[in-house]
Every structure is written in structure tokens, then in C-alpha cells.
Amino acid sequence: ILLDNFNITVRKGEVFGLIPVNRYGMDAFLKLLQQNMPLHYGYVYYREQLVNQWQRSHNRTNRISIIRNKSSLAEDLTVVDNIFVLRRGFHKYLIHPGMLERLLQPFLDEIGINIPAGAYVSELTIFQKFVTEVLKAVVAGSQLIVLENVSTFISESELEELHRIIRLYAERGISFIYITAHFEEATYLCDRMALMVNGQIIK
């Protein structure tokens, strides 16, 4: 059993901090959020709807985005390709790059970050990749975004900018689970926090 006595509730527009003492059960938790893997016992609700339970697993994915310190973006594609073309439900086959760049610009203006829309992801800084992944999640309609240990490889000023973007989207009603080993960082950003020890939640 990787998760035991594990119970968290994340409210709409909340930044929920999760502080793991060790990684035991973390991969299972993240996989469970997205993929509704079979449960021995318990329930999973997403947007107030029952999406997984111990009696029956639907094996359907939830529209939840997970951003780790190692980018999941396609390095050999552009920023706009990663955000728009690779997202689930995108069906257009012939797309003018300029049109996609114009679609992206309002999102960049909103967060006040300048990322070259036509640049290849391999050319971006780590911070720019994190921002691109957040934008990709927002465009895809994710109402819950999980960020895991993203502060490790970016500067303090970049982390402040990332926190500002998280807060902006939280005010728009998007929820976040912010996973970090640093208590001070979680205290600064998060509305509520929980401690995770050996696959259990310690309030």
C-alpha cells in the first residue's frame, strides 16, 4: 500500500501546499490524480464529481496538469506548437504559425511575461519552460495544476515571478497543488498546507 490514511481537499482557486518528508507514495499520488488507477479502498473526486472509487475504476484520465522540475515539453517543437497543437482535442491539420502566435499573445500579456512564441523549446530557459507548461495547462482547460519541486533550478527572482503567475491564475479560479520540501516557501505562497510522511497525510 503506497497511500494510506491519505485525505486532502483542494478548493477552487486555492494554492494547496504539500510538503513531503520523503518520496514514498508520491509517484502513486500523482499517477492517481491523472489516470484514475485502481484503488484498494477510497474515492477520488474532481470538480465535485466522483471520478474513481475502490469498487470500480473508470480508467479515464482527468484534466489535471502536472509540472515537474524536468520539462515534459517537446524540445524540438515551438512554444505555440507545444501549447496549442499538442493539446488534447486540437483537430486542425493546417495551421498558420502566425495565427497561433496571435492566439497566445493575450495569455502572455495577461501574465506580463515575454516568451518568443515561435522559439523552439530547446532554446528556452528553465523558467520559461515552467511558464510555458503553466500556459499549456491553462489553455487545455486544466482546473487543477500540480507543480512539483519547481524551485530547485530557477533563481529567487524567477521563483517570485512564478509565484505571481500562480496567484494570478488562482484568482481566476484555477486550483494548484504546490509540492515543495521547503516549509518557508510553502508558507509564503500557499493558502493551506499538509505534511506527507510515508504515503500518509499528517495535518
Predicted feature locations:
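Q-loop/switch helix immediately C-terminal to the Walker
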Residues: 70, 75-89
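H-loop/switch region of ABC-family ATPase nucleotide-binding domains
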Residues: 180-181
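Conserved catalytic segment of ABC-fold P-loop ATPases
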Residues: 188-195
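Helix-to-loop junction immediately C-terminal to a conserved catalytic motif
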Residues: 34
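Hydrophobic anchor residue at the start of the ABC signature
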Residues: 133-134
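Conserved beta-strand
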Residues: 2-11, 42
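Conserved ABC transporter NBD signature motif
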Residues: 42-53, 58-62
